[in-house]
């Protein structure tokens, strides 16, 4: 029940623009080396794009977004981000030209809404200091005991943090899976029971 790795990140919503095409994306600013310690995202980046991302920065774009915008690795797009202070709702969004370094293909919904950006660049776009982040992603040795974890190692973190684990956020999905398994088990028992009853009935009638 211990933390084995952690990765700071900056998360924000932006518009990606290519010509007259726009797409809303959830951008996550990450450090490549730290992200490798807590997730397997690098395995789903096409070609050598993950290494290029580590060396050059840029944007790792979900394959669904790339297809909708008609862009590929090496192309340039514009990121439209609302003003960091959020005081003037009518203010023009910040516009930043970034190069698409790689394409992320998960063959799922995230392909249509997810993008990765280098952490320092994300901090700069959001007007954050170097030690300011949105959150810290943790990897633990036993995911099923996250509610019993000791998070004291985060007490000295330079920024106030609030704990949110997967059980609180997505635990209902796990419980639903368990419920479906139970229902399927009961259904199979009933089907087998009815089949056995029919066989026995047929044999009795034949005798």
Feature locations, PLM:
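A structural signal for hydrophobic secondary-structure junctions
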Residues: 2-116, 120-131
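Hydrophobic alpha-helical context, especially transmembrane and signal-peptide helices
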Residues: 20, 53, 93, 167-169, ...
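Mechanotransmission and gating elements of multispan inner-membrane complexes involved in transport
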Residues: 86, 91-184
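Hydrophobic alpha-helical transmembrane segments of multi-pass inner-membrane transport and secretion
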Residues: 178-207
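A short, structure-level motif marking secondary-structure boundaries and short turns
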Residues: 47-48, 135, 199-200
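A generic secondary-structure micro-motif detector
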Residues: 52-55, 139, 204
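Poly-acidic low-complexity segments
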Residues: 31, 49, 142-145, 198
């Amino acid at each position: 029940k211990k933390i084995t790795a952690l990765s700071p990140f900056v998360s924000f919503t932006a518009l990606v623009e290519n010509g007259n095409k726009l797409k809303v994306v959830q951008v996550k600013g990450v450090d490549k080396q730290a992200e490798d310690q807590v997730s397997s995202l690098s395995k789903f980046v096409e070609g050598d794009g993950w290494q290029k991302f580590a060396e050059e920065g840029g944007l790792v774009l979900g394959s669904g977004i790339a297809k909708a915008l008609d862009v590929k690795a090496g192309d340039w797009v514009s990121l439209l981000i609302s003003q960091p202070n959020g005081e003037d709702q009518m203010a023009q969004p910040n516009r930043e030209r970034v190069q698409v370094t790689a394409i992320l293909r998960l063959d799922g919904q995230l392909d249509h809404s997810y993008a990765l950006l280098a952490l320092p660049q994300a901090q700069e776009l959001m007007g954050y200091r170097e030690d300011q982040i949105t959150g810290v992603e943790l990897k633990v040795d036993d995911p099923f005991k996250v509610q019993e974890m000791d998070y004291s190692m985060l007490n000295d973190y330079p920024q106030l943090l609030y704990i949110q684990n997967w059980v609180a956020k997505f635990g209902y999905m796990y419980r639903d899976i368990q419920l479906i398994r139970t229902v399927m088990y009961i259904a199979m028992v009933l089907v087998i029971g009815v089949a056995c009853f029919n066989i026995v009935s047929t044999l009795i009638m034949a005798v």
